[in-house]
Amino acid sequence: MDSLLSICDIKEEVSYIIDLAIKIKAGEVEDKPLEGKTLAMIFQKSSTRTRVSFDVGMYQLGGRGIFLSSSDLQMGRGEPISDTAKVLSRFVDGIMIRAIEHQDVVELAKYSDVPVISGLTNLEHPCQALADMLTVKEHFGSFENKKICFVGDGNNVCNSLLLIAPLLGMDMSVACPKGYEPCEDILKIANEYANENNTEITVSDNINVALDNVDIVYTDVWVSMGDEAEKAQREKDLSHYQVNQKLMDIANDGAIFMHCLPAVRGQEVSAEVIDGSQSVVYDQAENRLHAQKAILYHYLK
């Protein structure tokens, strides 16, 4: 069964899904294509954008979503993931899961007879990356000759961006302190994609080097859910990696600022930047809806 657990799963369909999202957003797709379809939405972690966008997306496509927290499921009381997958497959047409551990999503998909869509794990955030690239295409018109720089902790969002950027012909750099580099396995695959598409991936602890010739500056929170015990150390280690106007001025003229939200103003980004004219963060947030509608259409229709 085809599922979306990683950008790697849609290596050949990335451009198609983004273009489909543009058509759906413009109202150029048939009305209510998922009428009668049901999506189970499992949340092991709290969410604003993921929950609302998937719920609204299913409704607008003619289907419905069922919200399931860990406390709603026997899985939260020890039922094997395999049993949960097999049973839910008898009731619904697809499963979206926002999980703590990536392996839980892999196992769910292994035993599911319906498509499984990752709404975030500790390793990747493919839906966010698709929404981000939809935003980039809307803003610049194409991905040609564009470069994105991720500043800060090389986390799950960074991992998905590293995979999707070269597939669309974009260069990508990561600026992070030592010890906060992206996943090595992800970097290996990203470099393979870059070689196939004549693009470049770089990782550096030097922000000035990473921001050279950059059109998109992207950051995320320093302390993600689950990292609270490391809060003080993370804030210390990442203190020189705040995206402020001085950093934005290093990027190319016309560069945009991106953030997947929620944001902590005064930490990973200054209020001046996130609330300024170069920021497209609310376009990104809205595009979660349109990108995920394209994903739902692709997997459930």
Show where each model-derived region lies.
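Positively charged, low-complexity intrinsically disordered leader regions
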Residues: 1-52, 56, 124
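Active-site cofactor/substrate anionic-group-binding motifs, chiefly glycine-
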Residues: 38-39, 43-91
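Glycine-rich phosphate/diphosphate-binding loop of Rossmann-like nucleotide-binding domains
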Residues: 44-57, 140-219
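Short, structured coil segments at secondary-structure junctions
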Residues: 61, 91, 111-112, 168, ...
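Anion-binding alpha/beta catalytic cores of soluble intermediary-metabolism enzymes, centered on
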Residues: 93-164, 259
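Rossmann-like adenosine-cofactor binding region
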Residues: 192-272
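Adenosine-phosphate binding glycine-rich loop
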Residues: 254-255, 261-301
